[in-house]
Regions:
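Conserved NAD+-utilizing ADP-ribose enzyme module
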Residues: 2, 8-62, 66, 90-92, ...
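An acidic/histidine-cluster motif and surrounding catalytic segment
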Residues: 59-86, 90-91
Length: 190
């Protein structure tokens, strides 16, 4: 299956490595917290909010939303493990798009405000995905969950983010859906 992938490290002729940065270690504490209870997850997020405030105060750019990303991924992994185990783990997978246009649109959304030096590091690749049944998900649900966790002030918001994860894995389409292809199978850059 021909798909498209953006990367700052990939090279033509090589295979993509699932979770090459080993980010699952950043997600695991949030999954463990949710397995305990929502209060534990909430407290872990509060710690992240404190770290975000400290990083912001000392102008450590590009770090202030990392905990939100990993907390959101933790919610999605918790829901996947408990309700949708047939799907691949998001963190230990690669992400693709079925068209160049979709990949370029995501690049503009994610990197549109970055300085030119950062933008120049990201390249678009055509990839041969060797997966007979890749998963297609509406990435808007992840973005919505991210926003909820970014603004987290109550336990009810955790339930909202969990519902967004269910929508994502359940195949529900949002109003302006944007599909991403998620696979942990072999993928070679051509």
């Amino acid at each position: 299956m021909k798909v498209y992938h953006s990367s700052d490290t990939a090279q033509v002729g090589t295979g993509l490595i699932n979770d090459y940065k080993k980010n699952i270690e950043l997600v695991r504490p949030f999954v463990i917290a949710l397995k305990q209870n929502k209060e534990c997850f909430f407290n872990l997020c509060l710690s992240g909010q404190y770290i975000r405030a400290v990083l912001g105060k000392f102008n450590m750019k590009n770090m202030d939303t990392y905990f939100v990303k990993w907390a959101s991924e933790g919610i999605f992994e918790y829901v996947r493990q408990n309700e949708f185990p047939e799907f691949p783990n998001r963190i230990e997978s690669n992400y693709f798009f079925d068209s160049i246009e979709s990949s370029k649109r995501l690049f503009e959304e994610d990197w549109g405000e970055a300085d030119q030096e950062e933008r120049d590091k990201i390249r678009l690749f055509e990839v041969e995905l060797r997966d007979d049944h890749p998963a297609f998900f509406d990435m808007n649900w992840f973005d919505e969950a991210f926003e909820v966790i970014y603004e987290l002030e109550s336990l009810d918001q955790i339930d909202t983010a969990i519902e967004y994860a269910r929508n994502y894995f359940g195949g529900k389409q949002s109003e302006n859906y944007r599909f991403e292809i998620v696979s942990n199978k072999e993928a070679v850059i051509v």
